[in-house]
């Protein structure tokens, strides 16, 4: 999609306290969110969700995610390539123990890091979606690891693979005049 770079530069610069601007290239392709626990340098990634961007055209040039779903539609080989990239990226950040949240795009069949952060995800991904999808209590394991307890890596292995989907709603402007059926 074409974007007026002069306009984008001025808008970004107007919000920059230093007047500096960073330009990134948009890589088209499916995106996934990952959630990992790193134990002694090894990343265990029970959280793996396809991200949903059905409103890219509506909100352009802004990129608004409107949910995700598990299990991923990606094949096992591609999922492993994503896990390997998360492992490599976490290692390059020096993370030997702790949590890693990753957002990855697959462009031309190759995974690329959009974001990698030493934190848990928000938006119910780590607290609700991963446990519902896999039976893995990643938040509990992360808390126990932070308290210095050892984690049995078997508890990070999925117990099942149940479908889970979440969508964010962006309703049109208006006024709610009534709510019917709330008593049922």
Question: Where on the chain are the PLM-derived regions?
Answer:
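ATP-dependent carboxylate-activation loops
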Residues: 119-141
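Alpha-helix initiation/capping motif
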Residues: 25, 71-75, 131, 156
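Electropositive phosphate-/nucleotide-binding environments in soluble metabolic enzymes
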Residues: 2, 31, 76-83, 132, ...
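Short beta-strand-to-loop capping motifs
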Residues: 1, 36, 169-172
């Amino acid at each position: 999609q074409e974007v007026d770079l002069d306009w984008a530069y001025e808008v970004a610069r107007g919000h920059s306290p230093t007047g500096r601007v960073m330009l990134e290239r948009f890589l088209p392709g499916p995106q996934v969110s990952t959630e990992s626990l790193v134990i002694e340098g090894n990343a265990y990634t029970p959280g793996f969700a396809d991200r949903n961007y059905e409103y890219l055209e509506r909100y352009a040039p802004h990129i608004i995610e409107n949910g995700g779903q598990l299990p991923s539609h990606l094949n096992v080989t591609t999922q492993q390539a994503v896990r390997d990239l998360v492992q490599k990226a976490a290692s390059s950040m020096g993370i030997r123990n702790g949590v890693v949240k990753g957002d990855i795009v697959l462009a031309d069949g190759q995974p690329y890091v959009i974001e990698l952060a030493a934190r848990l995800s928000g938006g119910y991904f780590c607290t609700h979606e991963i446990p519902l999808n896999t039976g893995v209590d990643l938040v509990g394991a992360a808390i126990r690891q932070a308290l210095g307890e050892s984690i049995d890596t078997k508890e990070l292995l999925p117990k099942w693979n149940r479908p889970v989907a979440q969508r964010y709603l962006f309703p049109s402007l208006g006024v709610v005049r009534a709510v019917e059926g709330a008593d049922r």
